[in-house]
Amino acid sequence: MEGPGAGSGFRKELVSRLLHLHFKDDKTKVSGDALQLMVELLKVFVVEAAVRGVRQAQAEDALRVDVDQLEKVLPQLLLDF
């Protein structure tokens, strides 16, 4: 059984649109499996960013996560992915 918010995530249409914004050739297509994989990857990336942001805020004794904490964890997060 999955936890709270398990049904939330990125819509395939949104991810497809984001990918196509960066393709040089307009005829480039993305298979359904590749699209599903990108949806899952983005979901994991965002959750991991949130968790690391919370840990950084706790280390700084901050009561809430701010963009400053996310900016501090982003370089290592990008290297890990």
Swiss-Prot record:
Main location: nucleus
InterPro entries in UniProt: CENP-X
Entry-linked PANTHER family: CENTROMERE PROTEIN X
Similarity comment: Belongs to the CENP-X/MHF2 family.
A single MF term (Gene Ontology): DNA binding
Alphabetical list of Gene3D superfamilies matching this protein: 1.20.5.4980, 6.10.130.30
Cited function: DNA-binding component of the Fanconi anemia (FA) core complex. Required for the normal activation of the FA pathway, leading to monoubiquitination of the FANCI-FANCD2 complex in response to DNA damage, cellular resistance to DNA cross-linking drugs, and prevention of chromosomal breakage. In complex with CENPS (MHF heterodimer), crucial cofactor for FANCM in both binding and ATP-dependent remodeling of DNA. Stabilizes FANCM. In complex with CENPS and FANCM (but not other FANC proteins), rapidly recruited to blocked forks and promotes gene conversion at blocked replication forks.
Protein's cellular compartments: Nucleus; Chromosome, Centromere; Chromosome, Centromere, Kinetochore
Cellular component, GO, one term: FANCM-MHF complex
Modified positions (N-acetylmethionine) in chain numbering: M1
Official protein name in the record: Centromere protein X
Organism: Pongo abelii (Sumatran orangutan)
One annotated GO biological process: cell division
Gene name per UniProt: CENPX
